[in-house]
Amino acid sequence: MNFETVIGLEIHAELKSKTKIFCSCSTKFGAEPNANTCPICTGVPGTLPVLNEEVVNLAIKAGTALGCTINKYNKMDRKNYFYPDLPKNYQTSQFDMPICSGGLVEFEHEGKEVKVRLNRIHIEEDAGKLVHVEGEPISLVDYNRVGVPLAEIVTEPDLRSVSEAVAFMKKLKSILEYGEISDCRMEQGSLRCDANISLRPVGQKEFGLRVELKNINSFRELQKALEKEERRQRELYTYGEGHKIVQETRRWDAAKGKTIPMRSKEEADDYRYVVEPDLPPIIIYDEQIETITKSLPEMPDEKKERFLTAYELSEKEVDILIGDKGLATFFEKVVELGATPKIASNWILGDILRILNDRKIESEDMHIEAENFAKLLKVVEEGKISNNVGREVLDEIFDENKDPMKVIEEKGLMQISSSDELEKIVAEVIANNPQSVEDFKAGKTQSAGFLMGQVMKLSKGKANPKVAKELVDKKLSEI
């Protein structure tokens, strides 16, 4: 029997606010444990929350960017459950009246247009973080993250493959980044997702029992977790053990490469939602929505059209560039400084990405500035240094943002393009390799390539290849 995979996602995006959702504590990542806390976010009795207006505006911005309906009357609710990372024993969230409803995300995947409906977007506070002490039977709790504002974006179960789910997440990340709604730093946990996956026989309308997967914080882990769970369910159905699939929550264990049962899947009733009595309803006005809509910056699809028109790049190149906001911004700055778009694109998509992957860092964290990179591309394009030397210089200047011209000058890397200088080198190579000259005269044209290699070796790679080849060919033709 053939089965169809059905996937829905619940994405938690940290909103780009400098302060928490109900207090003035900082949301900055990387502080000392429990440094960014106060009596309000840790739930000390007698304290009262005050809703951060910026959080509401960012949620409206997200809803506008994703084609949602903005609900002008919505409210906060208490979601009750007990866990060490939740100091109040409830999470302030939204239940039946979210800030945004509906929405649609469209993207191309494997040659076809995919449309994924959104169910809702609601705002809520994040929980703390458990830190497990190695070798000790205890866990510590860092409450810095408690109260950090989240937008939970819930899709309909419209995804039909693991690769579609990953492609959707990349598209959503791009929209949130370009809209300046979230920084989406997955390695810092500011963009996470839970995945609901089920299988059903092809042609069946009813959904199968869904399993929720938690602890997913990268595109690679999302793919691995979904593939493993999809395989697990498929094997159970194949061997007649489909009854063993139950509606449950499973945790993705990246180290073991498998999903592990956590608990049976909760329903809304299990959380005993109640209206938050300490916060008034949220009222949103038409003027507020209009102002926020007008403030939306250029979005990914708009930027793609502009790049294709303005820079004459291939669609594949543009897709990779705009898929990383940091790279796209860097590319535009370099071009504005005079770099040829095609050359800038080739170097960014080749060498800059290579270095980022080697260093395991994000484009936002690279130190090299567009001005210095543009200088480097200029001397390469003018033939003053070779591509290979350019790559060596890039590796050296990347981390400390050095001036490439100083590095080239200090190391004497400038390419030799003077015919007078190169003629001396070519003459020496010809004189030192009489057998290769005889071979060339005998019709072995590959000998010219060998002699050219000797010219590059003698010049320590600094000979201008084009000029050097012309001189080698000329010298051989005269013999």
Swiss-Prot record:
Listed PROSITE patterns: GATB
Subunit field text: Heterotrimer of A, B and C subunits.
Gene designation per UniProt: gatB
Gene3D superfamilies the UniProt entry points to: 1.10.10.410, GatB domain, N-terminal subdomain (1.10.150.380)
Provenance organism: Clostridium beijerinckii (strain ATCC 51743 / NCIMB 8052)
Cysteines joined through disulfide linkages: none
SUPFAM superfamilies in alphabetical order: GatB/YqeY motif, Glutamine synthetase/guanido kinase
Ligase as UniProt keyword: yes
Protein name: Aspartyl/glutamyl-tRNA(Asn/Gln) amidotransferase subunit B
